[in-house]
Amino acid sequence: MSESSYKTSHTAIRKARRFAMQGLYEWLVTDRRFDIDGKLGWKANAPHDIAARTRATNAMHTVHIGYYHEMMRDIPEQIDALDALISQHLDREINKLDTVEHAILLVGAYELQNRLEIPYKVVLDEAMKLNNHFGATDAHKLINAVLDRMAVELRAPEVDADSKANLRTSQKAAAKPVTKADKKTDINANNSDIEEKPIASNKPRISANNASVKRNSVSKALANITDYKASKQNDTQNTVEEIIIKPTSIETVIVDKVDEIAVSAENIANDQPVEENIAASNDKVTAEVELLDSNSANFDTKSAELNDADEKSQD
C-alpha cells in the first residue's frame, strides 16, 4: 500500500505524532545514549529500523505515514539543534530530563520550528495530550512552560496577534457586565412588579386553606338543607290552611245542594202525583245526604293526615 493512500486528517496526524514520540523514546534510551556514552559499537536501533518495525507490528492505515516518517527522520538529524533550543528555556540540564518529557519536548520544538502551518496553540495542546497519555502527573507544568517560551521566540508574530485578539476580547468582556447589570436590575424590577400584582389562576390551590374551603362547603350544604326544610314546612302549612278554609266552601255546597233538591222537589210535585213525588224526593235527598257524609268523612281523614305531616315536619 502506497503512502498516498493513508489518512491525512487531523486525527491521523495526531496518531502519527504519538507513534513518533514512542519511536523517539525508544531511540533516546538506546542508540542516542550509546552515542553520548561513546559506545558506538552497541548502536543497533537506528530510527529507520524503529519506524519499519512499528509499521510491521501496528495497524497504520489510520495514521499519517508521511508525517510519521518525517519526524522519525528529521528529529534525530536535528537532535543537537533542538536540544540546544530546549536547553535555553530549562532550569536544569537537559540530560536530567525524564526521557518521556524529553521526547515530547523534541516533538513540540520540531513542530514550532519547522511546521509553521500548525498553530502554536495546537502544538502546545497536542504536547499536553501526549503527556496525559505517557508522562508524569506534574510534567505538564514543565512542558507547557518550555514550549510557551519557545513559541514567543519562534512564533513572535503569531503570538503577538493572538495576544492582541485576546486583549480585544477581554475589553469587550469587561464592557459587557455593565449592560448585563442594568438588564439584571430591570429584570429584578419587573419581577418585583409581577410579584406585587396578584395573578388569578384557574388551578385549585393546594395549601392549608383547604380546611376552610371544606368548612365553607359544609356550611353551605347545611344552609341548603335548612332552606329546604323551611320551604317544605311552608308548603305543608299552606296546604293545611287551604284545607281548613275548605269547610266553608263545603257548607256553601251543601246549602246549594239543599236548595237544588228543594227546587227539584217542587218541580216534581208539580209534574207527578203526590205519593210518587214524595218517594222520589225522599230517595234523592237520601242519596245527596249520603254523598255529603262521604265527602265530610274524606275531608276529616285528609285534615288528619295533613296535621300528622305538619307535626313530623316540625319535629
Swiss-Prot record:
Protein origin, superkingdom: Bacteria
Pfam families in the record: NusB
Region entry Disordered, spans: 296-315
GO molecular function, one term: RNA binding
Keywords, ordered alphabetically: RNA-binding, Transcription, Transcription antitermination, Transcription regulation
InterPro entries: NusB-like_sf (IPR035926), NusB_fam (IPR011605), NusB_RsmB_TIM44 (IPR006027)
Cellular component terms (Gene Ontology): cytosol
Single biological process term from Gene Ontology: transcription antitermination
Chain intervals with Basic and acidic residues compositional bias: 302-315
Family indicated by similarity: Belongs to the NusB family.
PANTHER family the UniProt entry points to: ANTITERMINATION NUSB DOMAIN-CONTAINING PROTEIN (PTHR11078:SF3), N UTILIZATION SUBSTANCE PROTEIN B-RELATED (PTHR11078)
Function noted in UniProt: Involved in transcription antitermination. Required for transcription of ribosomal RNA (rRNA) genes. Binds specifically to the boxA antiterminator sequence of the ribosomal RNA (rrn) operons.
Stated name of the protein: Transcription antitermination protein NusB
